[in-house]
């Protein structure tokens, strides 16, 4: 899909929106057209579906994340779904695309694109999001308190150098890829020493405190390769203090 997207951009195929208020789906529709051009069949996306595009003939899905530029690009709101490399048996590829934040016209181009395997963002596939609630809040004890967790994750633009104004794919090093893709960087992410296992929120002080446990996979390295259709520039992982 990297080549398909790059070809479309080179051919001047732009994102189209119905109006200025149409912000959620234009980039998703642009990518949908690339799938259709390649005759790649998928389940029709829905508002609360994850990932956005679930392929029919292979266990693969694409999750789209459009980023207006200039604007917030180093991280994004995952809402109620943390990044996954594998979800319900499907490998998940995140598609991060940057485009003008406030275009004057209803058709506009894609600045750059990163197709990123979800495990580059989060290697743990075991966590399952659930909303919970407890009743008993308020003066009369009959208010329901809902625990609806929301998540924020880094984007490849926040983690990497060398991806601006480029078309890049970040895949596990063990994956076989097309001969048309050229490696432009070897990336290693190392698991943290501890894992968050819970949190406590004090309603009287509004203080939020996390609880942790030792990570049994602490120090384990996960290897990825950055690919492009051309060699320049190289892609490198930013130092943590520079993110």
How should these model regions be labeled?
Residues 1-51, 56, 60, 66-243:
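Nucleic-acid endonuclease domains
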